[in-house]
Amino acid sequence: ANKVIVLVPGSNGDESEIVYDIAVRIEGRLLALGASVFLTRGAKNAPSESERIAFTNTNSTDLFISLHTDTHTNPSAQGVATYFYGSDAHGVHSVVGERFASLVQREICARTNLLNCRSHAKTWDSLRLTKAPSVRVDCGYLSNVHDAKNLATPEFRDALAEAFIIAIQRLYLAAEDDAKTGTLRISDLRSAGIRR
């Protein structure tokens, strides 16, 4: 509750409708828990990356989440990967971004059958130029039959949305209030008084 979350659904080609739908599912759940949520685009419009970053930086954002799918020429490429701001060469990284990337990666893998492609530090503009902790999540490969089939179902998209919600909640929970990965449910958060 009382957190400002910016959701950035990717808008490139085939991923556009899928990640927008996932973002709307996340938005609804976050609103029900009392968070303030901003989607950076509607179903048909797509602001530029610099516009999304500027919007995020002017809205007291607590967390910036960029949602995407991936493709590859090799149809065997599959799985979920998360990215946070960091550069091993320069010895810098976003501590909160890295923690959230790890949490959402764990929750998605615990709740779905997506291959764990792990979390990675990157210096992409959307991660580097936002003032808030920022994470990009590639929720599977549309070029892979298995991932594409999963991403096409409402049940799978609901599982992804719940993974995001629980990861966000874990990010802000005290360690002693946390539960084993894959076991916490939205109803648990409500009964614990997380919702205002």
Segments the model singles out, each with a brief description of its role:
Residues 2-4, 13-196:
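Active-site-proximal helix/loop segments of hydrolytic enzymes
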Residues 8-10:
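Short loop/turn segments at strand-loop or loop-helix junctions that form parts
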